[in-house]
Design a protein with these regions (language model features):
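Charged boundary/loop elements
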Residues: 45, 49-61
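Extended C-terminal regions of large enzymes
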Residues: 300-304, 309-388
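Histidine-centered nuclease catalytic patch
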Residues: 404-441, 445
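A conserved non-catalytic segment of reverse transcriptases
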Residues: 121, 206-279
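Conserved polymerase palm-domain catalytic core
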Residues: 3-6, 16, 57-58, 70-202, ...
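Acidic, low-complexity intrinsically disordered tails
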Residues: 375-376, 446-463
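Short metal-coordination and nucleic-acid-contact micro-motifs, chiefly zinc-binding Cys/His arrays
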Residues: 392-397, 425-429
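Short, intrinsically disordered, charge-biased short linear motifs at domain edges
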Residues: 385-391, 418-423
């Protein structure tokens, strides 16, 4: 398959409609052909390093080494101090991807213009009918996020330039952007209105505009939602908690899985599915004041599981069900598990340790400062491990104790005993790949008696 730009012309995309569960609305996505996807991906790889060198410092979406947690950390830094600005402009770009001006893209995106024009004007087929594309970029193109980011880069400078002073007051007009969601802090409501007008002028040049429904100016005492979190101050104290909308959405997700799907799958699969949801949600919200929310979610999960068990075993009493499927831990907590395997259990969010997220250094570039981002990724992996288990992760340096290879982000890991199964001390525990667990029994039975094997594993872990 040739990816030479000479005589290249993108074929019309295929339009599909998907339901956005979070926003309860339909999304229209145009999907390119396989060859066009390859060409788009090639130019995305070319454009990404360029966009990194020109991006706003406090833009955090769809960028290597940056995340919503970094955006959260900078929002906290902007409003948590006693002398921080108290007025917040919350804004959202209306239909950002669909409305970017093709003329602006052609004039400002530095890749092969002929290929770029072909991407933009490919059109789409829907219901066997061909439609032209006059503006916007398709969500189905991997390059679209980069183009959208570049179209919004420059907002930070526009806001700073509004202050008309030789020494910029960085606390006034503090700007944070995650995709098309924008937060700007201000000392006064009047200056916040001025910032809003400047953003609207900036967007109009690019064919975009702010969403009237989602754009507002609020006082920090009222609080505001951003990226599924609620930020507010009460009696001078700053708080961050999961937003009501995020909690309700997660509760609905759990109910749908436990009640609707729980009857169709095994108990082991049910526990595995619940744990995956809980750990993912807690991993995102553990950087907030989430302890009360975590306890609430634990109660929700227990009540849903009890409701499910009553449906499955209508002839059993509630006490019989609890005695069979719940056991009491040393601290008195009731835990849902397999009756024959108490170690296969539903995790409790109450046990999750809250942490502070160390935000990215703003002037670091992932294409230049690779060592910094590698070390940061390693420290984040350690942070995902709770309590005393961190020392095991550090000891193994992120490598499987069985095979010696590194753990990748998408690989499941398992905690196993190295020697006696009765010894649960940290010194007797190690992490291995889930895929290595099939060899675990044979490995434990040898009790690592082969000195050559022990030395080899130690060498791998120390690499």
């Amino acid at each position: 398959m040739s990816l030479i730009p000479d005589n290249y012309k993108a074929k019309p995309f295929r339009r599909v409609v998907i339901q956005d569960k979070h926003k309860n609305k339909e999304r229209h996505i145009s999907i390119p052909t396989i060859k066009d996807r390859c060409m788009i991906s090639l130019y995305a790889h070319i454009l990404d390093p360029i966009s990194e060198s020109t991006a706003d410092k406090k833009s955090f979406a769809f960028r290597k080494g940056r995340s919503a947690l970094d955006a959260h950390s900078f929002v906290c830094d902007s409003v948590k101090y006693p002398d921080s600005p108290e007025w917040i402009l919350i804004s959202d770009v209306k239909s950002c991807y669909e409305s970017i001006s093709h003329k602006w893209i052609m004039d400002n995106i530095p890749i092969n213009k002929k290929v770029l024009y072909s991407f933009l004007k490919a059109g789409f087929i829907f219901g066997k009918e061909l439609f032209p594309t006059e503006h916007g970029v398709s969500l189905g193109m991997s390059i679209s996020q980069i183009i959208a980011n570049m179209s919004l880069d420059g907002l930070q400078k526009i806001i700073f330039d509004l202050q008309f002073s030789k020494s910029i007051n960085y606390s006034n007009g503090n700007f944070i952007r995650y995709a098309d969601d924008i937060i700007v802090t201000s000392k006064t409501r009047e200056f916040a209105i001025k910032i809003k007008s400047a953003i609207e002028r900036f967007l109009s040049i690019r064919g975009m505009k702010l969403s009237e429904k989602k754009t507002k100016i609020v006082h920090i005492s009222q609080g505001f939602d951003f990226l599924s979190r609620h930020y507010y101050k009460q009696d001078g104290i700053f708080y961050v908690i999961p937003s009501s909308k995020a909690i309700k959405s997660f509760e609905d997700n759990l109910q749908n899985f436990i009640i609707n799907k729980g009857k169709q799958i095994s108990q082991r699969s049910l526990i595995k599915g619940i744990n995956a949801k809980l750990q993912g949600w807690a991993g995102y919200h553990r950087v907030e004041d989430s302890l009360n929310t975590f306890r609430h979610i634990d109660c929700v999960v227990s009540s849903l599981l009890l409701k499910l068990m009553k449906c499955i075993f209508p002839s059993k009493s509630e006490k019989q069900i609890i005695d069979t499927y719940w056991y009491e831990e040393y601290d008195g907590e009731k835990v849902y598990s397999l009756p024959q395997r108490r170690d296969i259990r539903v995790v409790h969010l109450n046990d999750v340790i809250l942490v502070d997220h160390q935000h990215v250094i703003l002037n670091k570039n992932p294409y230049i400062d690779r060592e910094y981002f590698e070390l940061r990724l390693k420290s984040q992996d350690i942070q995902k491990v709770n309590g005393d288990l961190k020392s095991i992760w550090r000891r193994q340096r992120g490598r499987c104790f069985y095979c010696g290879r590194k753990f990748f982000k998408d690989q499941q890991k398992k905690l196993v005993h190295m020697h006696s199964l009765d010894d649960n001390s940290i010194e007797n525990l190690s992490y291995i790949h889930d895929s290595c667990s099939c060899d675990e029994i044979e490995f434990i039975q040898t009790d690592i008696e082969n000195p050559n094997e022990t030395d080899y594993l130690k060498q791998l872990i120390q690499v």
